[in-house]
Amino acid sequence: MHWPDTIVPIEESLKAFDELVKEGKVRYIGTSNDTAYGLTKANETSKNKDIVRFESIQNNFSLLNPRFLDELSTVCKNEKISLLPYSPIGGGVLSGKYNNSFYPDDARFSAYMKHENPRVQAQATRFVNDKTKAATIKYLELAKEYGISPVTLAVAYSKHFDFVASTIIGARKVEQLDESLAAFKFKIDDELMKKIEEIQKDILYPMG
């Protein structure tokens, strides 16, 4: 379920999913962009009604947006629900391409800022703002210290936690894909994690 449905009761949605699973059309179901409350309510509904439950949740999670760790991670660990993080490099921001020019000509958020819909523009400024740029500078320095690409660092962070099943990555060029795949051989140790946490404390919630 791509977004929480604010109109249809969660029980009704889960019963519909349950039928699909019983018919063999779907193996497992997952949700996306939900809150700790929403995921907990859905999970309790599945238990009480003895119907299929969400096995995964797909949410925005990255060095620039670690909010999942506040509450949702606890739900996932206790209920054994896996996170599939998307935007692990913050929509490309963590690559550093927005540091020299706020909106490069060939970048996604440059197009967003020119969009006539204010909501689309707001999405761009959520990803690219003074705080995300400041945090990115620190992560670029940290990646350089460890001799890796900032993209590799970002993807490695997104898959570091035990409640993460897999990380959703995207690339337009082969070299971009290589930087992401390198993260699967790079392990974040305790010392590096402490440095990351220091940056996160210094610049709280860059994406709001």
Predicted regions and their residues:
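Beta/alpha (TIM)-barrel catalytic core signal, keyed to glycine-rich beta->alpha loops juxtaposed to Asp/Glu
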Residues: P4-D5, P9-E198, M207
